[in-house]
């Protein structure tokens, strides 16, 4: 990405948003971050991320919900971003089953507002955006039987509302790109983990329970597989993609979708055993956790597995962090995190 590029990162106090904004600031970009700072998980962790970002003189933050159309419009007019990276979303598959309203508000209405602001970004003499990058999710593949998951595969049968909203985002983004010429790229992330992560994610929640000596719940009796992808690999992928807006396809549309995943699924049981070993090495726990084995939960899928052929072809990049090394990095950070709490 060019030095001094003006980049808007939505969801900047979130897990991926924080790490991405940090990387862009290191590259010399001018970064505006927005976040609604909701309490879906520990706000203190979001505040800590934000505190680190605001130490950079080229970072500016506004507390804002992308569902607030007027506030977002004013921000675009004031900052005139060149690149927009939309990471703001209501996350979580299981939470969407009992709290659908927040997913429609953030993931549908909020993303529509982002698209509208991009559509009108060249008005009033502004340069306008040259690339919109947005977070989709591996959850759009639903219960697809074919693996690895390719961006060419049909994704018409979501098994959660969260997945349905992410697929809806892809459809809306394509329509806006086709109608208004907005260069747009969607990124399907696969089970992102790492330091300063989301407490609602399994690895973080398991670590919390292990520290408290509580029993951890293993769904589908441990017979599940996830394509665990380390945060630095995800950030590197987003950065690579953001630098290069898509070329026109045969229909004249500047729109692409890529998987960003480690393309090496690991079993849930191996993941838990690895987490235990890393936490013991970091001095966080002294013995393995007690485990309760349960059936598959609604909204869950048996396996995720990324085909990153298109990412490798177009950018010469694919994630490669081994789970063992990435999880140790998380455990070492978590040890400090626990001591501070």
PLM segments and residue spans:
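N-terminal Rossmann-like NAD(P)+-binding domain of SDR-like oxidoreductases, especially those catalyzing
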Residues: 1-192, 235, 317, 333, ...
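Hydrophobic alpha-helix immediately C-terminal to the catalytic Tyr-X-X-X-Lys motif of short-chain
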Residues: 168, 172, 176, 206, ...
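Conserved GTPase G-domain signal focused on the G5
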Residues: 196
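C-terminal substrate-binding subdomain of Rossmann-fold SDR/epimerase-dehydratase oxidoreductases
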Residues: 208-341
